[in-house]
Amino acid sequence: MIGGPSRLDFVGIGAKSARELIMKRSGNVLERILLTNDDGIGAPGLAVLEQIARELAPEIWVVAPEHDQSGVSHAVSLHHPIRVSERGLRRFAITGTPGDCAVMGVCHLMGGMRPDLLLCGVNRGANLGMETVFSGTVGGAMTGMMLGVPSIALSQAWTDRYQVQWQTAATLGPGVVRQLLAIGWGEATCLNVNFPDLPAEGVGALTLARQGVGLLQGMQVETGTDPRGLSYHWIAFRRGPREQGPESDIDALQAGRIVVTPLRYDRTDEEAYQLLAKSLPRE
């Protein structure tokens, strides 16, 4: 089993920016990329992500969940052990979350060889608006960012989940990642990229957007009875049209463009902070 350092500090004040980390290679060439996802080691989106990554770097590492981990957000496993199974050269499945995958890859399985970039995806379905709070795809990228690795979450929108246009992400993904790397982004930021549900030739330009409200209207619980007479419950999202803010991610995606939104772990609401500051002491 490949092993490495057991500890790596979170990114903080004085850490190099993502652009500086990436540009350390002459000619902006990446040496190694770490891949993960939330749909699991056998997901078609992970195969697409591998296609994208192999056009960007010679050394690709895959550390992905053994089973589907959709909706686990930034969770990491603190109360049960993580099992690792080797599935090929630099390819591992673990009994954990996308966040666990990022930690296991960067801090252990890669043997101390830091990745130049972490890519998480390609998710089956868009990750937009407030649903990014639940997204394991975004959570995996956010964890990579907190470990000091430039990180991008990638998702492919669909109308019919059984007719996902994976070729769109596969065809356009390498160019999108190269364009973003050439620009660079902040040290405490990860990027959330969504591809529209269109053939590659019909897709618009890469567009910067803000995180909108999205389509999430609420949650619901669906209940049934199994063959043994025991009840079971499924938690599901309830979606529908909602008014979006200016420059929203969902409006840009529905217009047929590839959307990128920079996301941070700092969730402080500045407007509410200033309101509360009028009555409460500050640290």
Predicted regions and their residues:
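N-terminal amphipathic/basic-hydrophobic helices that include classical n-h-c signal peptides
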Residues: 1-26
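A cross-family phosphate/adenosyl-ligand binding-site feature
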Residues: 24-33, 47-114
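Short beta-strand segments
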Residues: 36, 63-65, 95, 120-123, ...
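Short acidic, Gly/Ser-rich segments with clustered Asp/Glu that frequently serve as metal-coordination loops
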Residues: 39-47
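Electrostatically charged, flexible surface regions
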Residues: 101, 166-283
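Alpha-helix C-terminal capping segments
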Residues: 105-112, 139-150
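Glycine/threonine-rich flexible loop motifs
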Residues: 126-135
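Glycine-rich phosphate/pyrophosphate-binding loops
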Residues: 145-168
